[in-house]
C-alpha cells in the first residue's frame, strides 16, 4: 500500500509545471500587474534587484520605467559593485553612476549591498556542483523579501542574462564574483581572468551561486520579472558599446521559478524569428549558457517544465512608454505548455505506472 502511494505521488510530481506569466505589453503599469499575478507574500523590507547600467548605457531597465513597481512594493532598489574595472567597482564611483543614471531622483531609495567589503557574508551551497560557498554583501540581511528585476538579453561571458544571472553574478560581492568566475578556486579578483574556469564550470558555478539566494529567502518571499526588450547580445555592463538589438521586443515574463522564467525567455526568442535570433542563440550555445539553466534545475531550485500563461495587454497593442521595438499582436492561447525534458519525465511516469500495475 505504501509503495502504491509513493508511486502515485511520483507520477503526480512528474507532471507538475511551474507557472510563467507572459504579456506582450511592456509598460510600467504592466510590471505591477505581472507582480500581482505571483501572489507573493512580500513581508518587511522589500529589495528590488536591478542593474544600475553603465555610463551612457542605452538598454538597461530605466528607473522611471520601474517607478510604479517601486511605489507599489514600497521597496528599495538594490545593487552590488562590480569586480572588473569600472565606475561600479568602487562604492563611491558606483553611487555617482547611480545618480547620473537617475536612480536617486525623487529620493528613490537605493542600497549597494556590498558597499563595505568587510561586511560580506558567506552562504553555503546546499547541493554543490562546482562551488561550496558564495559571498554576498552584508546588507542582504536588511531585506526580508526580494523581487528580481531582469533585463533579458545576451551576455558576452554567460551566453545570456536573465533571472539566474541576476541571482548569481548580480547578487555576489566582488569576492563572490571571483569565486564564480574561477569555479571556486580563488577569492582574489586578480585571478579571475588569468585563472578563469572553463565555460561549463563557470556556468555551473553561476547556478550554484543562484541557489544560495533562492535558499536565503523564504518561499513566497522572492519572485522574478524579466523584460524581453532591447535584446542586445551584450550585457548592460557593456554600456554604450553594447551592439544594437536585432531582435524585436517580445514582452514581460513573471514567475516564482527562476529556472522556468529563463527557459521561457529562451524559448520565446527561439519562436520569435528575427534577423538577430540566430546570432543570439549561437552565442548562448557557444558559451554554454543553457548549462546554467540545466544545472539550476538539477540542484533543485526550479524546473524547465512550465505553463506559459498569457496576460492580455492593451487592446491597441501598446508596448509601453520606454521601449522602441514593436510587439506582434497575434493572439496566444491562454496557457501553452512547454517542457525542457518532457519526454524524459513522461517516460519516468510511465515506468512508475507500470511498476504500480505489476
What is the meaning of each model-derived region?
Residues 1, 320, 327, 344-345:
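Intrinsic disorder/low-complexity segments
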Residues 2-13, 347-357:
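Cleavable N-terminal signal peptides of Sec/SRP-targeted secreted and luminal proteins
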Residues 3, 17, 314, 338, ...:
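Intrinsically disordered, low-complexity segments enriched in Ser/Pro/Gly/Ala and basic residues
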Residues 8-16, 338-343:
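Proteolytic processing junctions in secreted/extracellular precursors
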Residues 15-72, 76-320:
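Extended, low-polarity segments enriched in aliphatic/aromatic residues
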Residues 309-317, 349-358:
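C-terminal helix/juxtamembrane-tail motif
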Residues 316-334:
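Ser/Thr/Gly/Pro-rich low-complexity, disordered linker/stalk segments of secreted
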Residues 329-347:
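C-terminal GPI-anchoring signal of eukaryotic secretory precursors
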